[in-house]
Amino acid sequence: MTHTVAVSGASGYAGGEALRLLAGHPFVTVGAITAHSNAGERLGALQPHLHALVDRVLAETTADVLADHDVVILALPHGASGALAAEIAERSPDTLVIDAGADHRLESAADWEAFYGTAHAGTWPYGLPELPGQRERLAGTRRIAVPGCYPTTSILALAPGFAAGLLEPRDVVIVAASGTSGAGKALKPHLLGAEVMGGMSPYGVGGGHRHTPEIEQGLAQAAGEPVRISFTPTLAPMSRGILATATARLRPGVAAADVRAAWASAYGREPFVHLLPEGQWPTTKAVLGSNHVQLQLAVDERAGRVIVCAALDNLTKGTAGGAVQSMNIALGLPEQAGLEQQGVAP
């Protein structure tokens, strides 16, 4: 059976990445392709790498255009998905709506209002299949909230330790470097090549980044209790990719062998998350353009901490690939369908 998939926000990075993956998906057909300010333009003028779709014309982003597809992927800025998703659901209740933006990720309305400053649109099933029990929640659902790129990286880095009861929940530090595509395609002076190339800079320092409560929410799900983190994102001079270094204090009596065994057990059968052989460390280049995640860990016995490094492509596993992976589960398709791409080297 072939499913028709519409993509909104197709002129942006996340929407373009979704189309790249869907164009090679064996069980879907790309339906409506929509945008806001770029409606009426030829897709090839904005996404020239999408050779199979270059002659498609971008439609207006409306519920009328998007409804009645089997699947709709909303690759829109935060605050733009909530009302549109509700309208699509009213017109076409059987459509699987996948929000690649932030609007439906957080369970806490108070956290949403504190970090985003608008009314909470509600909570949808969270599209991170590797979290304990999450595949069961995604199977058959008609609504999916795609995790943010930093939360995907950070949660995958530390969730096994929390799920196994090895980590203290209130002493967690995460520093993550991301490529500039994570900030979107809109022109911003601090993202100009002359500003970015040759240097790195932190931002959202001091607990102010909007992904902070989402990371805490995912880790709390794994831990079964609240988790508090200190999160510092950093802008790196590359177009795509995230490398996160996450550290947490070990509970008393936890041995280094227990730590590695917990991560190996959690991810040993996962198709996309890979604990590397000891001594080999993740690189963003190794996962470029793929839905794969590389992890490595070490125990700092002197400090009593575990250090986990995780690398993924923020546009693939961190956004569009995560959307397609969760879509596959919701539709009962093979989980790896359309996601067979390997990393690119050199």
Curated annotation (Swiss-Prot):
Q: Which InterPro entries did the record assign?
A: AGPR_AS, AGPR_type-1, NAD(P)-bd_dom_sf, NAGSA_dehydrogenase, Semialdehyde_DH_NAD-bd
Q: Where in the cell is it found?
A: Cytoplasm
Gene Ontology molecular function: any one: NADP+ binding
Q: Which BP terms from GO are recorded?
A: L-arginine biosynthetic process
What biological function has been recorded for the protein in this entry?
Catalyzes the NADPH-dependent reduction of N-acetyl-5-glutamyl phosphate to yield N-acetyl-L-glutamate 5-semialdehyde.
This protein's encoding gene: argC
Q: What is this protein called?
A: N-acetyl-gamma-glutamyl-phosphate reductase
Kindly state one GO CC term assigned in the UniProt record: cytoplasm
Q: In which pathway does it act?
A: Amino-acid biosynthesis; L-arginine biosynthesis; N(2)-acetyl-L-ornithine from L-glutamate: step 3/4
Q: Which organism is it from?
A: Micrococcus luteus (strain ATCC 4698 / DSM 20030 / JCM 1464 / CCM 169 / CCUG 5858 / IAM 1056 / NBRC 3333 / NCIMB 9278 / NCTC 2665 / VKM Ac-2230) (Micrococcus lysodeikticus)
Q: What is its EC number?
A: 1.2.1.38
PROSITE patterns with a match to the protein in the record = ARGC
A Pfam family this chain is assigned to: Semialdhyde_dh
Reactions catalysed, as given in the entry:
N-acetyl-L-glutamate 5-semialdehyde + phosphate + NADP(+) = N-acetyl-L-glutamyl 5-phosphate + NADPH + H(+)
Which residues carry out catalysis?
C149
Q: Does the keyword Nucleus apply?
A: no
Task: Write the record's keywords in alphabetical order, separated by commas.
Answer: Amino-acid biosynthesis, Arginine biosynthesis, Cytoplasm, NADP, Oxidoreductase
**Highest rank taxon of the organism:** Bacteria
Predominant location of this chain? cytoplasm
Q: Which family does it belong to?
A: Belongs to the NAGSA dehydrogenase family. Type 1 subfamily.
